[in-house]
């Protein structure tokens, strides 16, 4: 992937028996289903909920952007801490942080809705509580991805990351679907439920997820030194960082305007928007789940090969969203978007994971995992700004971004050759 020669990393991650591996994988993926539920509940209701308290599209987007910036800054730190403290401990911290932060966020929204807080005070407190929430919640995914990297081999890493994505997406199906139903009670009910689910998941992880022994660094390297040296511009992972940052920026730009798009194009009320958009998000997540289970778990391709399949699908989806003017067409476009992202997300994470040593998995999970929040820092602000100019501009802009990104991915060949060398080296050591 880089033009500089590098040593081929070895695969000295902890070995588990087949039974232990299946059990650890099952518990991790079950926990991630709950995490996916909690993460996606907010997207279905934030747009209409924000409008109910008098916030503009740009104010709503700025809350997501600020929290995403914090996740971007905190994720690498949590990833490195998972190398030192262990994956399970960091996951539990993140889950409890999510529950508490989400509860505070929902409480401020409640006070603003009933008039106990002025709109400006409510907006500032929502920003503060969401930033606090993000600073601790950002521990979950780096630790989870690193845990999966710990229990998979070089040859099965892409499938393992695909399974992580599939679990999240299954939760993402439940989140908007149940969130839309719960929003029929009150718009805040989904957030209260998400906090309770996070606490239950934390207890589930504490008592059932096996601890994985820490991976020793290669001879001559200390764990702390090796992990701290890994950065965004490391030539082994830099191409993946470019892909991830631009890919997620485009996704965020679209994601944060879709609820407004549904409400304005279809002429829906706030509750109807939450319910209809929740169904659309559920369909999108289902398509993502199908692409990960039906394709990634059955076909062996390199990460960049999967990206070459996924990016054109996403570009087509964004063009369709710009042109769609009916409910069915908008949902169809979101299904395409889900299918494409279901392939692109795990491929990006797996590629970055495979590029580094086993003892660097926590660090790389934090760095790669922060590309999404980086995209969601810039994307929502651009999306809100473009949407105020023209409702279809965010989708055409994202379409334009993905074309040069696809060209960049098509030109990446060295990383695939290096991955083939790693798999061959592992096969030789096994025999």
Identify the role of each PLM range:
Residues 139-152, 343-357:
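Intracellular juxtamembrane helix-capping segments at the cytosolic ends
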Residues 44-59, 256-275:
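Short amphipathic helix-loop junctions that connect adjacent transmembrane helices
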Residues 33, 114-139, 245, 329-343:
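Hydrophobic core of transmembrane alpha-helices in multi-pass small-molecule transporters
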Residues 2-22, 210-241, 426-431:
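Juxtamembrane intracellular "pre-TM" segments in multi-pass secondary transporters
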Residues 74-87, 290-303, 387:
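Helix-to-loop junctions at the C-terminal end of transmembrane segments
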Residues 96-119, 313-325:
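C-terminal ends and interior cores of transmembrane alpha-helices
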Residues 69-73, 276-299:
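Transmembrane alpha-helices of Major Facilitator/SLC transporters
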Residues 129-170:
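Cytoplasmic helix-loop-helix junction between adjacent transmembrane helices
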